């Protein structure tokens, strides 16, 4: 989380009654514990993204633990639960990541590449034109333009009759049981 942008996003989601899943980077937790507690308290799902946003493929077991296990422990200590999903940095996985994940691996079906394009109108149009039932949309909460895009997408898709839910709620609604080490990009079954 980033205090200014994440707070604005949480406020906007709360005003709209919308829940989301946040994949957190360990380095960004210090000093932002209250934001993470707020996410959890308001019904958002918390996921693991890694400690240092380091590529997880090819890591030794010890290095994987440094990136994922340490974040899992930190979040478990803070939140009092350990029911996390994992989104590897850059969406990159291999057999080692799948073996060591200890959680379902959640990727995405719509990626507007908001890290490289700050045009909110273009981002919003891209997402809204592609969105279908069961999609997982990747956006970041650290860029002001991404937060604006997220809230505009929520408004547009709510107007079209879409519902927004956490990753766990999405797959449960589709009758899909998430399994540790398995990769998921959307929930189109059921």
Specify the residue positions occupied by each region the protein language model found.
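Alpha-helical scaffold elements lining the catalytic groove of polysaccharide deacetylases
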Residues: 8, 54-81, 92-133, 146-152
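Short alpha-helix boundary/capping motifs
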Residues: 3, 29, 90-91, 147
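Active-site-proximal beta-strand/loop segments in catalytic clefts of secreted hydrolases
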Residues: 23-27, 50-51, 87-91, 108-111, ...
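C-terminal domain-boundary segment and adjacent tail
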Residues: 15-16, 28-30, 145-190
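Active-site beta->alpha N-cap acidic-glycine motif
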Residues: 1-77, 81-83, 156, 163, ...
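A polyampholytic, Gly/Pro-enriched intrinsically disordered region
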Residues: 127-135, 184-190
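Divalent metal-coordination and catalytic microenvironments
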Residues: 13, 46, 86-89, 105, ...
């Amino acid at each position: 989380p980033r205090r200014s942008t994440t707070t604005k996003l949480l406020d906007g989601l709360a005003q709209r009654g919308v829940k989301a899943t946040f994949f957190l980077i360990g380095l960004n937790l210090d000093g932002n514990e209250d934001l993470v507690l707020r996410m959890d308290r308001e019904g958002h799902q918390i996921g693991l993204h890694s400690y240092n946003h380091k590529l997880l493929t090819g890591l030794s077991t010890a290095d994987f633990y440094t990136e994922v296990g340490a974040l899992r422990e930190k979040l478990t200590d803070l939140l009092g639960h350990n029911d996390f999903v994992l989104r590897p940095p850059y969406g990159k996985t291999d057999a080692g990541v799948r073996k060591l994940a200890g959680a379902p691996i959640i990727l995405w079906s719509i990626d507007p590449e908001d890290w490289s394009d700050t045009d909110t109108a273009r981002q919003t149009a891209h997402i809204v034109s592609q969105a279908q039932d069961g999609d997982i949309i990747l956006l970041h909460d650290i860029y002001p333009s991404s937060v604006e895009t997220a809230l505009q997408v929520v408004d547009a898709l709510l107007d079209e009759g879409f519902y927004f839910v956490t990753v766990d709620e999405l797959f449960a609604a589709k009758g899909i049981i998430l399994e540790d080490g398995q990769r998921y990009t959307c929930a189109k079954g059921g």
